[in-house]
């Protein structure tokens, strides 16, 4: 695929995504299923625009690679160590039990025992790309169900390495001393990557940032991601695992958030490409000729996997409210099954018919997951929103609320308690089902649902409410809600939480003036108390705090069009710091002559 052929393929992919995904969202089946359907439409069994599916599928794995890098950035070695019990307990248990059960079923359906073993292991793997995307959409990524799901996926990624090593043994090619030498060299190269990354990456990025050219920083981020992926691929290991480790090595660096911003656009596009490629890989010929076998295989895979995951979640102590979501989101086959089964076919562990059948089962199981999660959502809505009406509209007992609060984590709870203490009528929308369950025990009227859905906002009373307070964890959700409210509820006053300066800039650019950066006010208050401890007069410390607040807000507005780390911004920040020092010096001279303020401020 070269020249104009590549450009044509890119054009077809973009057109398919632009057409299919908005339609899928309007139909309520989700973006992931929209991508899969688009892939079927343009693939060999659809309109036939693209036929070289294997090459596209291999390239599209970069979407998973970028996703794992960003996940690695959000972790650090200490947090990873905290997850060891769930990774090697639940993760290992899920792979071993699922592989044993599914492998036994394959053996009893005329698979040779070698083929049954590798088939069971491959089917035990879940789709990292799909599961993480759905966990983010459903708000699971910050509750215990999402954490446990991530641990299971991480163990599965690591389990691919010994699974690939197992294939030659099952094929009867145990190998000799040369193979052990190759394994030793791979281990040494992997250790070299860890050590080199640990001591070279931060100095590299410091050197690049010093140039003041943002494009070079983005290029360096892409170099690290693609370089670590190709290095691991050359070793015969998981590309996604390599970039995940690279992300962890940079997780505690000062460049963490800027790297996320640089990589995010590529991750989204390539993940979409991955899902389209999976849809293209669906062999409808096998589906038609083995329809009953395929349908039974998909049902068995999803049911058995969900049941095992649900049981493990119960043993692990997961709350009942999140067990269903945890079991459903990991119930499908995964992208690593394509790698394992193809390798097994090349070693003649699987024959052509078995390979085609297993790949179709895996692909269709991936298509069932978005639908299964919608069914689970409906079950949870009925359970936690106490729906009494027979229609299918979202149910919220709004009672004409004055304020709608979206997100009821620690930040949202403080706001809610303050408003309720002042007899304000509020409606709270939260999509973390475990938080809904817990808050209801304490008497809060919290309703389960995704506030980015227009019907839920209407049911919550957005047309009559005076204000909406947005405290979402994800910046994308915050901006989606802002646009939704501005378009459909123009009289609804928007107040929002910003997690940092980048999100604050986005809110300002979209006309939201009432926002609070979550750490800014508390940090200022602690700074004021530090000034008091150092002997500053209370009134003077308060005025210093207010001067700093006003100047920082002015800088936020002035620097809005500029990018973080640009030379112009750095220069303006230094200028503002000097300006602030001059203000404080004048204040101190004035206060030394006339201290007519109060003596205490507590």
Curated annotation (Swiss-Prot):
Parts of the chain that traverse the membrane: 4-24, 29-49, 55-75, 87-107, 115-135, 152-172, 181-201, 207-227, 230-250, 261-281, 296-318, 326-346, 356-376
Gene3D superfamilies: 1.20.1530.20, NAD(P)-binding Rossmann-like Domain
Disulfide bonds: none
Compartment(s) where it occurs, according to its Swiss-Prot or TrEMBL record: Cell inner membrane
Keyword annotations: Antiport, Cell inner membrane, Cell membrane, Ion transport, Membrane, Potassium, Potassium transport, Transmembrane, Transmembrane helix, Transport
Membrane protein topology class: Multi-pass membrane protein
Residue span, RCK N-terminal domain: 400-519
Domain of life from the UniProt record: Bacteria
Gene Ontology MF terms: glutathione-regulated potassium exporter activity
GO biological process: proton transmembrane transport
GO cellular component: plasma membrane
Pfam families the UniProt entry points to: Na_H_Exchanger, TrkA_N
The family this protein is said to belong to: Belongs to the monovalent cation:proton antiporter 2 (CPA2) transporter (TC 2.A.37) family. KefB subfamily.
UniProt xrefs under HAMAP family: K_H_efflux_KefB
Function: Pore-forming subunit of a potassium efflux system that confers protection against electrophiles. Catalyzes K(+)/H(+) antiport.
Protein name: Glutathione-regulated potassium-efflux system protein KefB
Organism whose genome encodes this protein: Yersinia pestis
Organism placement in taxonomy: Bacteria, Pseudomonadati, Pseudomonadota, Gammaproteobacteria, Enterobacterales
The encoding gene: kefB
């Amino acid at each position: 695929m070269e020249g104009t052929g590549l450009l044509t393929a890119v054009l077809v992919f973009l057109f398919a995504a632009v057409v299919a995904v908005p339609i899928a969202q309007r139909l309520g089946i989700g973006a992931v299923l929209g991508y899969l359907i688009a892939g079927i439409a343009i693939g060999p069994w659809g309109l036939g625009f693209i036929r070289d599916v294997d090459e596209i599928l291999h390239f599209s794995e970069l979407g998973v690679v970028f996703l794992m890098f960003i996940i690695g950035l959000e972790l650090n070695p200490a947090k990873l160590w905290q997850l060891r019990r769930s990774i090697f307990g639940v993760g290992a248990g899920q792979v071993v039990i699922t592989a044993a059960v599914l492998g036994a079923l394959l053996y009893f359906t005329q698979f040779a025992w070698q083929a049954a073993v590798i088939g069971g292991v491959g089917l035990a793997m879940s789709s990292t790309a799909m599961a993480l995307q759905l966990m983010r959409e459903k708000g699971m990524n910050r509750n215990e169900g999402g954490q446990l799901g991530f641990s299971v996926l991480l163990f599965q990624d690591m389990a691919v390495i010994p699974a690939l090593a197992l294939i030659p043994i099952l094929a009867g090619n145990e190998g000799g001393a040369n193979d052990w030498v190759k394994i030793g060299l791979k281990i040494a190269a992997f250790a070299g990557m860890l050590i080199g990354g640990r001591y070279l990456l931060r100095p590299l990025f410091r050197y690049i940032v010093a140039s003041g050219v943002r494009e070079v920083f983005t290029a360096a981020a892409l170099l690290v991601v693609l370089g670590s992926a190709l290095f691991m691929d050359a070793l015969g290991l998981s590309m996604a695992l390599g970039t995940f480790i690279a992300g962890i090595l940079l997780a505690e660096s000062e460049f963490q958030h800027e790297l996320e911003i640089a990589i995010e656009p590529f991750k989204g596009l390539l993940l979409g490409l991955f899902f389209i490629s999976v849809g293209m890989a669906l062999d409808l010929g096998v589906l038609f000729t083995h329809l009953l076998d395929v349908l039974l295989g998909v049902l068995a895979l999803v049911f058995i996997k969900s049941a095992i995951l649900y049981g493990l979640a119960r043993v692990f102590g997961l709350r009942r409210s999140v067990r269903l979501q945890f079991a459903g989101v990991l119930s499908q086959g995964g992208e690593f099954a394509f790698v394992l089964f193809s390798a097994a076919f090349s070693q003649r562990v699987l024959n052509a018919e078995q390979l085609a059948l297993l790949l179709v089962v895996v692909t269709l199981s991936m298509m069932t997951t978005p639908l299964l999660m919608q069914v689970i959502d409906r079950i949870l809505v009925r359970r936690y929103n106490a729906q009494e009406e027979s229609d299918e509209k979202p149910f919220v007992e709004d009672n004409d609320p004055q304020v709608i609060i979206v997100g009821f984590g620690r930040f949202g709870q403080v706001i809610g308690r303050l408003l309720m203490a002042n007899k304000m009528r509020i409606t709270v929308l939260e999509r973390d089902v475990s938080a809904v369950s817990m808050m209801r025990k304490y008497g809060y009227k919290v309703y389960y649902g995704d506030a980015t859905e227009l019907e839920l906002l209407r049911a919550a009373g957005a047309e009559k409410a005076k204000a909406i307070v947005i405290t979402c964890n994800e910046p994308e959700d915050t901006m989606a809600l802002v646009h939704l409210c501005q378009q459909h509820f123009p009289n609804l006053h928007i107040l929002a939480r910003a997690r940092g300066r980048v999100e604050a800039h986005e809110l300002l650019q979209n006309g939201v003036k009432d926002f609070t950066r979550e750490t800014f006010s508390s940090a200022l208050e602690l700074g004021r108390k530090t000034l008091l401890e150092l002997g500053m007069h209370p009134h003077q410390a308060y005025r210093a705090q207010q001067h700093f607040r006003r100047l920082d807000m002015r800088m936020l507005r002035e620097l809005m069009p500029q990018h973080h780390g640009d030379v112009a911004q750095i220069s303006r920040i230094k200028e503002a710091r000097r300006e602030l020092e001059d203000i404080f010096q004048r204040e101190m001279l004035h206060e030394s002559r006339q201290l007519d303020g109060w003596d205490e401020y507590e």
